[in-house]
């Protein structure tokens, strides 16, 4: 309901970064483009995954607060790598697989990247609306070049492994398919956890570490998209 009380400029600032990235990935799908209905449903599934993640994160954070002091490194590591990252990437993956694994449109390996990025950006879009509604335009500008493309990058890594899993499954290599499906959750969760963990460290030197990490994440993700789109 908060959307009805947010300035249209703020809504645009929150939504446009995700739309730009969605369009970019869609254009990179050069072979047998996916139907608009499927892609829209993936964005909606990404939005739905935020609600499941919120509940899981609240429960996980409460349990973690009982077990460890909040000021400890162990608390922060478990919070960001397990409670937050694994919850968010896990629910994205579950809804991604539910919607696309048996879809007749899933006929190219790069489709896995397209699907995962659309789910991830659905998540990022909805999350971004909440942050911008609470904190304003300055937050929108920062997140437009950090958190939103960050979610897209996590989606790229998820999609790379998800697409490989589908290829192996089609070839009858179910062991490798299962291994890739596992990596489709673990790899983006690891990157997501590292992103959050480094971003929240209080050491001033970590600002440079975060910048290097983000630039490397963006560069590798872009390379994976470029190579993947030309490999089918």
What are these regions (language model features)?
Residues 1-232:
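Hydrophobic alpha-helical segments at protein termini of multi-pass membrane proteins
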């Amino acid at each position: 309901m908060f959307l009805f009380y947010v300035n249209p400029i703020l809504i645009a600032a929150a939504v446009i970064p995700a739309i730009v990235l969605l369009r970019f990935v869609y254009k990179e799908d050069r072979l047998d483009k996916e139907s608009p209905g499927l892609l829209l449903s993936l964005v909606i599934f990404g939005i739905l995954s935020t609600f499941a993640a919120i509940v899981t994160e609240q429960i996980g954070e409460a349990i973690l607060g009982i077990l460890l002091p909040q000021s400890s490194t162990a608390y922060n590591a478990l919070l960001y790598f397990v409670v937050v990252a694994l919850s968010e990437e896990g629910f994205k993956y579950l809804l991604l697989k539910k919607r696309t694994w048996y879809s007749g449109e899933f006929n190219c390996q790069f489709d896995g990247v397209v699907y995962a990025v659309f789910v991830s950006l659905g998540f990022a879009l909805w999350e971004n609306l909440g942050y911008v509604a609470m904190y304003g335009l300055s937050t929108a500008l920062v997140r437009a070049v950090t958190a939103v493309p960050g979610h897209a990058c996590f989606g790229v890594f998820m999609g790379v492994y998800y697409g490989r899993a589908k290829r192996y499954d089609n070839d009858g290599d179910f062991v490798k398919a299962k291994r890739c499906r596992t990596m489709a959750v673990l790899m983006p969760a690891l990157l997501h956890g590292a992103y959050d963990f480094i971003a929240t460290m209080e050491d001033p030197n970590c600002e440079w570490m975060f910048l290097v990490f983000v630039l490397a994440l963006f560069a590798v993700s872009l390379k994976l998209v470029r190579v993947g789109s030309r490999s089918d």
